Regions:
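Primarily recognizes the serine-hydrolase "nucleophile elbow" in alpha/beta-hydrolase
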Residues: 163-167, 207-247
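Short beta-strand element of the alpha/beta-hydrolase
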Residues: 150-159
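N-terminal cap/lid segment of alpha/beta-hydrolase-fold proteins
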Residues: 9-14, 19, 27, 45, ...
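The serine-hydrolase catalytic nucleophile loop
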Residues: 160-171, 184
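Catalytic nucleophile-loop/oxyanion-hole region of alpha/beta-hydrolase
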Residues: 186-217
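Ser/Thr-rich low-complexity repeats and stalk/linker segments
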Residues: 35-87
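Conserved alpha/beta-hydrolase
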Residues: 174-189
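Short, compositionally biased P/S/T/A/G/V-rich stretches that sit at domain boundaries
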Residues: 1-11
Length: 247
């Protein structure tokens, strides 16, 4: 009897890239429970779905709806987006976690004990992307640049927590955009709270971006979630050098 197998089209991929997971050589018609476990930043996450193998003993996760699990409809990435946080102790993330691929362990177990598994690596920072600290001209943040000329540039704003959410800039640069993760409070040298933030500081950031030789006359956008989304809308309505807003 052939041992059950698990395969995937991309073992290493960007965090937002779809992958196709296939299970083969399970007993035909058998139910197969698939578990995907990962540690992301400081928490452990897990998703689970049960499928029925077809007459050839195959399960195509991208094309089959699970019989049960943490998601219910056909979804190629269901085992990723439906993951639930496990009640484990907090794990200390790597110091440079944005630069560090994280692993997702996929395990499939048939009702009669057949097993297969694989490990995937997910990346926030694509090949050739560079990251540099910006602490000049009154600005604090991270600048992410893609290899080659950028398609456009984005000023990335954090939300009400005041953190510099590097992963957004890393992902944008991995898709060809220059991204400046701009801090505007709760960082050294900046206001402690989200009060009385002068708009002039954002004008300074926009002018700084426009001076960069790689930007030229390319589009400059601003993006932010949560309270950062409110700020992005305000900046787009205030400064004509902002060409696009996502909030």
């Amino acid at each position: 009897m052939t041992a059950a197998r698990a395969s995937v089209d991309h073992r290493v991929a960007l965090a937002d890239q779809d992958v196709q997971i296939e299970l083969t050589d399970f007993p035909p018609g058998e139910t197969v429970t698939v578990t995907a476990t990962q540690v992301f930043r400081s928490s452990r996450w897990q998703a689970q779905a049960t499928f029925r193998a077809d007459a050839a003993g195959r399960v195509s996760i991208a094309r089959q709806a699970p019989l049960s699990g943490t998601y219910t409809d056909v979804s190629p990435m269901g085992l990723f987006w439906s993951a639930e946080r496990l009640p484990d102790p907090i794990v200390r993330p790597p110091d440079d976690w944005v630069l560090t691929p994280w692993q997702i362990r996929v395990e499939a177990i048939g009702q009669d004990g057949a097993r297969a598994g694989l490990v995937l690596a997910r990346l926030l920072l694509g090949p050739g992307v560079t990251r540099q600290v910006v602490r000049s001209d009154g600005l604090v943040g991270w600048l992410f640049l893609p290899p080659g000329e950028p398609k456009a540039a984005v000023i990335v704003l954090g939300g009400g927590g005041g953190a510099i959410d590097e992963y957004w800039g890393a992902m944008l640069a991995s898709h060809g955009y220059a991204a400046f993760n701009l801090a505007y409070f709760n960082q050294p040298g900046l206001p402690r709270g989200l009060v009385n933030i002068p708009l002039e500081s954002f004008d300074n950031a926009i002018r700084w971006m426009r001076r960069q030789p790689w930007l030229g006359d390319r589009l400059l956008a601003v993006w932010g979630p949560s309270r950062g989304g409110e700020l992005a809308l305000l900046l787009g309505a205030t400064f004509p050098d902002i060409n696009a807003v996502a909030a």
